[in-house]
Amino acid sequence: PGMGIYLPM
């Protein structure tokens, strides 16, 4: 649940 690129959660 993050940015997808920087925080792929």
Curated annotation (Swiss-Prot):
This is a cyclic peptide. Keywords: Plant defense. There is a cross-link at residues 1-9 (Cyclopeptide (Pro-Met)). GO terms for biological process: defense response. Probably participates in a plant defense mechanism. Has cytotoxic activity against human nasopharyngeal carcinoma with an IC(50) of 60 nM. This is Cyclopeptide F.
